Amino acid sequence: MPRVRRPAAPTGAATLLALMWLASPALPVGGFSYSEGLEPAVEAGLVSDEATAQAWLLDQLLLGLGRGELAVVAQAVAAWRRGDATRVRELNDWLLSTRESAELRLQTEQMGRSLGAWLQQRPGTDAAALARLLALPPAPSYPVAFALAAAGTPASLREVALAYAFGWAENMVQAAIKAVPLGQSAGQRMLGALVEAIPATVDAALVLRDGERMAFTPMLAVLSARHETQYSRLFRS
């Protein structure tokens, strides 16, 4: 697999804008339609106000993204940059294996495909690497697709992981505002709490080895499975 080329010298503003673009909720990948278990947590009475929503999201950041997903993003960026197709596939397989319900699996596959379709329209996208992404069986996961999109920038692995985590946080706060429901000011306070926790979470994820990554969130798995047959719902997960 050819390496994904990136500029030799970073251009700060361009790199920052590229990461902001990738983390933007306006990116056409459908992230707004998923709550990742938050909606069934509201239905079960586990989340009912700002305090419980904030605690839920912080736990999800620390116990979910921080222990596995963010590490995959960083490791996949490195793999794309050195042209290691075997490593990319291993990371994609591992990520998909951590999705313990049908709707969580559907979410990462749908968003991965959608990001791949967006990359097809972007000038300068490495065509060979994109073909490898879209050919990943059974589908590219969103973290691995995000990693390819970021691999062609001069951004460091830490900067890429920070952008990914912030994009996730912003989307989840918006989901909480709709599902609980909460006001915009409450949402900004929750986002502030997540932003404070993200740097240390990313730093911990960056040093994880393969055998240290994990995805042990049984409550989330149970709630997500229940959500698949929930009577009334706003979100797809």
From Swiss-Prot:
To which species is this protein native? Answer: Methylibium petroleiphilum (strain ATCC BAA-1232 / LMG 22953 / PM1)
Entry keywords, A to Z: Chaperone, Cytoplasm, Nickel insertion
Q: What is this protein called?
A: Urease accessory protein UreF
Q: Name one GO cellular component term.
A: cytoplasm
| Protein family | Belongs to the UreF family.
PANTHER family, per database record: UREASE ACCESSORY PROTEIN F
* Molecular function via GO: nickel cation binding
Q: Does the keyword Cell membrane apply?
A: no
| Family matches, as Pfam families | UreF
Oligomeric and partner information: UreD, UreF and UreG form a complex that acts as a GTP-hydrolysis-dependent molecular chaperone, activating the urease apoprotein by helping to assemble the nickel containing metallocenter of UreC. The UreE protein probably delivers the nickel.
The places in or outside the cell where this protein is found are: Cytoplasm
Report the domain of life of the source organism. Bacteria
Job of this protein: Required for maturation of urease via the functional incorporation of the urease nickel metallocenter.
Task: Provide the primary localization.
Answer: cytoplasm
